């Protein structure tokens, strides 16, 4: 028998309204115990909420949704009372005294909705993303995902793969036909079409992942290069202490900002040098840890000091120590001291931004560069949010499509192509939860709020 769960659906703490949600086959039993009746489905009823001895604990609106016409697909009872935490706790305690009722786990209401086919997995995740959105664009995109925009694109891909799989397997099952299906060009054309279709979805998903998770950008360089001043300029406030004393920043400073809707985690680090001070050495060690985990590095150079701005020395002292795949933007700071104009150029395969963090001249160039470098497009309508697991699944699907193309065009191997298409279908279906593991479901829903 399915379990009946209860939890507070509104945020803990003091508020104008507090809501308790009950979901499961015993929701009507709870209604009879607390309200003395079960409200008509989908009709608001103003009633007292009573304790076991008949004492009125609160009074408010009761709503009943009969299965399957509810968010979870189960019978659902919502009690909307006053938002005092003591009152809500008393009411919750009373409900938990009823046999067969237990406290919901985090995300369990959404999990019920998923298991009852009210939402697919991508839509369920979008609920948490909508709650956690840190910008207007992220909220709008999360709502698009909740409404099924992302799932629709994935399902269209799955349908295309299934159609092609059927065609390929038919050519394998009927080898005596006069027509060589593998060589007639139709399968290759369809396969290339799916590859292009998937690339479009991957591009949108990458944008959605940036919106959801942000990008980690680490500002690094020698002491007194102006790293903290740049952090303040990008943040638009005095987030870091700035002095003329080299080594002022000794620990990692973090600031979360938005550039035209793109979330960035900007991290200011201790100046990189051979330090004798133990505290500074620890700060430098932490700086290298952050650098290794970054999505992009901003390497600060002091343009007023010819030695520190020498790119050949910078390459040997710093750039050579970085992973080759880690993107780096070089910033020549303090152009106000030598009369230079703000500019953007390219040298040795690196983008170089010349600016003044002190006067903010050229800071907009850096902001625009970061947007472009991260592949972020401002103001896209109809986008959706995506998670890292979605990107991983799409990437694996793309890899197997390319392998399948090689099996078809170079080896004429229908059986191997069919297997690659099966794997593609499996990876894509993981996104919406058609094929997934219990461990994955547990990890996803445990990250939700209790009551969602």
Curated annotation (Swiss-Prot):
UniProt similarity note: Belongs to the TRAFAC class TrmE-Era-EngA-EngB-Septin-like GTPase superfamily. TrmE GTPase family.
Gene Ontology BP term (one): tRNA wobble uridine modification
Cited HAMAP family: GTPase_MnmE (MF_00379)
Pfam families for this protein: MMR_HSR1, MnmE_helical, TrmE_N
Job of this protein: Exhibits a very high intrinsic GTPase hydrolysis rate. Involved in the addition of a carboxymethylaminomethyl (cmnm) group at the wobble position (U34) of certain tRNAs, forming tRNA-cmnm(5)s(2)U34.
Alphabetical list of InterPro entries matching this protein: G_TrmE, GTP-bd, GTP-bd_TrmE_N, GTPase_MnmE, MnmE_dom2, MnmE_helical, P-loop_NTPase, Small_GTP-bd
Membrane spanning residue stretches: none
Annotated positions binding GTP: 224-229, 243-249, 268-271
An annotated Gene Ontology molecular function: GTPase activity
Binding note for cofactor: Binds 1 potassium ion per subunit.
Name of the featured protein: tRNA modification GTPase MnmE
Binding residues for (6S)-5-formyl-5,6,7,8-tetrahydrofolate: 21, 78, 118, 452
CDD domains in the record: trmE, TrmE_N
SUPFAM superfamilies in UniProt: P-loop containing nucleoside triphosphate hydrolases, TrmE connector domain
Cofactor: K(+)
GO cellular component: cytosol
EC number(s) given by UniProt: 3.6.-.-
Binding of Mg(2+), residues: 228, 249
UniProt keyword list: Cytoplasm, GTP-binding, Hydrolase, Magnesium, Metal-binding, Nucleotide-binding, Potassium, tRNA processing
RNA-binding is among the record's keywords: no
Residues noted as binding K(+) in the record, renumbered to the chain: 224, 243, 245, 248
Domain of life: Bacteria
Domain TrmE-type G, residue spans: 214-375
Main location: cytoplasm
Annotated compartments: Cytoplasm
């Amino acid at each position: 028998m399915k379990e009946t769960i209860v939890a507070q659906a509104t945020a803990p703490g003091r508020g104008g309204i507090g809501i308790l949600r009950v979901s499961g086959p015993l929701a009507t039993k709870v209604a009879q115990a607390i309200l003395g009746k079960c409200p008509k489905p989908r009709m608001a009823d103003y009633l007292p909420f009573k304790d076991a001895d008949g004492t009125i604990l609160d009074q408010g609106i009761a709503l009943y949704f009969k299965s399957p016409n509810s968010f979870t697909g189960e019978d659902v009872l919502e009690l909307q009372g006053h938002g005092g935490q003591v009152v809500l706790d008393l009411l919750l305690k009373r409900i938990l005294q009823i046999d067969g009722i237990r406290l919901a786990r985090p995300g369990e209401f959404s999990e019920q909705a998923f298991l009852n086919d009210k939402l697919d997995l991508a839509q369920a995740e979008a609920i948490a993303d909508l709650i956690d959105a840190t910008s207007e664009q992220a909220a709008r995109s999360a709502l698009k995902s909740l409404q099924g925009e992302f799932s629709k694109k994935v399902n269209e891909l799955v349908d295309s793969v299934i159609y092609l799989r059927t065609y390929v397997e038919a050519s394998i099952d009927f080898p005596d036909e006069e027509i060589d299906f593998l060589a007639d060009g139709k399968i290759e054309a369809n396969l290339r079409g799916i590859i292009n279709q998937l690339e479009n979805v991957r591009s949108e998903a990458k944008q959605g992942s940036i919106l959801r998770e942000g990008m980690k950008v680490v500002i690094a360089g020698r002491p007194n290069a102006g790293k903290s001043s740049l952090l303040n300029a990008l943040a638009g406030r005095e987030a870091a202490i700035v002095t003329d004393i080299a080594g002022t920043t000794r620990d990692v400073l973090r600031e979360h900002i938005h550039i035209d809707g793109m979330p960035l985690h900007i991290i200011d680090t201790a100046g990189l040098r051979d330090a004798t001070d133990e505290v500074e050495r620890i700060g430098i060690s932490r700086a290298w840890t952050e650098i290794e985990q970054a999505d992009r590095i901003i390497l600060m150079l002091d343009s007023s000091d010819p030695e520190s701005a020498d790119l050949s020395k910078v390459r040997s002292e710093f750039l050579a120590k970085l992973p080759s795949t880690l993107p780096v933007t070089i910033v020549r700071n303090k152009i106000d001291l030598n009369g230079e104009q703000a500019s953007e150029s390219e040298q040795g395969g690196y983008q170089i931004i010349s600016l003044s963090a002190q006067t903010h001249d050229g800071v907009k160039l850096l902001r625009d560069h970061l947007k472009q470098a991260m592949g972020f497009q401002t103001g896209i309508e109809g986008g959706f949010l995506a998670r890292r697991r979605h990107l991983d699944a799409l990437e694996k699907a793309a890899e197997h499509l390319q392998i399948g193309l090689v099996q078809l065009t170079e080896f004429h191997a229908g059986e191997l192509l069919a297997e690659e298409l099966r794997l593609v279908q499996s990876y894509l279906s993981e996104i919406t939860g058609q094929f997934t593991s219990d461990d994955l479901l547990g990890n996803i829903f445990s990250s939700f709020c209790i009551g969602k």
